[in-house]
UniProtKB/Swiss-Prot annotation:
Name of the protein this chain belongs to: Putative gene 47 protein
Domain of life (superkingdom): Viruses
Organism: Bacillus phage SP01
């Protein structure tokens, strides 16, 4: 496993830890790193829709703000990937 992937796995663990303490968060599904070094967070809401939001840093504040800030909704994870998959450098389904 290369250094970038190892570092990103630490970021995924950090997201998981923060996610558990957030209000109104759905079930965390995936964490992405885009080619532009922005993090994509995919969760599944109560209605079963996949929600994609973007943050530039990983912190409780940025993730909570993302939840209240109009994430894109999709019927399936495959739909999320077909729309945004081309810009993903690394992705981990959790």
């Amino acid at each position: 496993m290369d250094w970038t992937k190892m570092t990103f796995m630490g970021t995924v663990d950090e997201v998981k830890e923060i996610w558990n303490g957030l209000e109104e968060a759905g079930r965390l599904y995936a964490v992405w790193l885009s080619d532009d070094h922005v993090y994509g967070i995919v969760d599944v809401n109560e209605e079963g829709l996949f929600c994609l939001g973007w943050v530039s840093d990983i912190s409780p504040e940025s993730l909570q703000n993302m939840l209240g800030g109009g994430a894109e909704l999709f019927e399936s994870y495959e739909d999320v990937l077909s729309e945004h998959g081309g810009s993903i450098a690394i992705r981990v389904e959790v």
